[in-house]
Swiss-Prot record:
The lineage of its organism: Viruses, Duplodnaviria, Heunggongvirae, Uroviricota, Caudoviricetes. Converts 5-O-serinylthymidine (O-SerT) into 5-aminoethoxy-2'-deoxymethyluridine (5-NeOmdU) as a step in the pathway leading to thymidine hypermodifications in the viral genome. As a final result of the pathway of hypermodification, 5-NeOmdU substitutes for about 40% of the thymidines in the viral DNA. These modifications probably prevent degradation of viral genome by the host restriction-modification antiviral defense system. It catalyses: 5-O-(L-seryl)-dTMP in DNA + H(+) = 5-aminoethoxy-methyl-dUMP in DNA + CO2. It comes from the Viruses. This is O-seryl-dTMP PLP-dependent decarboxylase. One of its GO terms (biological process) is symbiont-mediated evasion of host restriction-modification system. Belongs to the pyridoxal-phosphate-dependent aminodecarboxylase family. GO terms for molecular function: carboxy-lyase activity.
Amino acid sequence: MNEPIDPKSFPSQPLSPYIPMHHIGKGPYKTIFNVLSLNRDHIHWEDYLYKHTPCELVANPETNQQVWFKREDYFAPLSCYMNGKQGINGSKLRQAIWLMVEHLKAGGSPDLIHGTVVGSPQSPMATAVSRHFGGKTTTVLGATKPTTCMNHDMVKMSAWFGSEFNFVGSGYNSTIQPRCKKLIEQQNPKAYYLEYGITLDHTLHSPERIAGFHMLGGEQVANIPDHITDLIIPAGSCNSCTSILTGLAMHPKPNLKNVYLIGIGPNRLDFIESRLRIIGKQANLPHITDFTRCYHDNPDYVYGKKDLQHASKSVSLAGLLMGIREKGESEITLPRFAVHHWDLHTTNWVRYNDLMDYQWGDIELHPRYEGKVMTWIQQHKPELLNENTLFWIVGSKPYIEPMKAACPELSMPEQVPVNEFTPD
């Protein structure tokens, strides 16, 4: 993949490909990257976009349970869990790299402008990706200021990677995102505008781009063990949910019976249903929506129902199972598996900004995402936690400390770097 590198010629850490029982120092190298470095002279992160992260059977000694985990937290270009914590990692990071590569192919610059909330890992991920490709990042923040923003770990990490910050008065996207677009229009027209949530708005982008974006993540389904019958996925932005459901159409699993989407943010069922239809048409995956819908907190949900008068009275049983098909869609086939959805956010079991720590063996589940899901599963569906179930880790909580050895060129700025831009 890359030419051999003399590890003495630079300070980053050369690593072997992931080998489960290969131990050096304090623990196994838990990353799929051969070299840990920001420097493109040493490694190209995009070379690893389609490399599979492993699936591992991990025991929980506290509960005597064993479950398979999809380790997307091993998509980690700057760390390897040497001390139990990871740097930037996960599915979202992979997608950000892909988006930047596509932008560069189209003639854009590696500079990046985006806006997000102070607690989002999007900020350090975006800044690191831009820096890896030789660019600079401007992060728009709302409801904070230069004197207080560094109290937030994700903002601090973004500053460590070299981001500058532009501040707006409101923390709402309706204020933050227009400022991002003004920055691009008036300061840096060739910069990449990274959308909130590291995604592509399917109402603005071509079906080809939407399909490519999700088929990238869908490729990670390929190495799910064939014996798996149940798949558990955190449902936040639902980009990963959509990618995994795309992957299940690309790489069908012979024994899969149930997919559990556990919603820890605002309900995104329409988002998933809309995107799957776009992807199915573009990628010739007509069976992509052929699954039984068990939307437990939305039992009357039918895709497209809100646009049809009296839909609930006119939809056939097949329509209820498969969702309303748009004109020109292929004939209904038997469902391949059941998709269950629980909405923990809207039903107030937990709110998106709440945090729930959860430790499964040596795995620290992300308290905003996977930690909530595992807590709910243990309380409501503990029978799922067995060797026929795979729990999809979208990513783990990132920390600066594990990346310091790979990034000796980085340091925390003495003052918050501020872009003073205000639009005309």
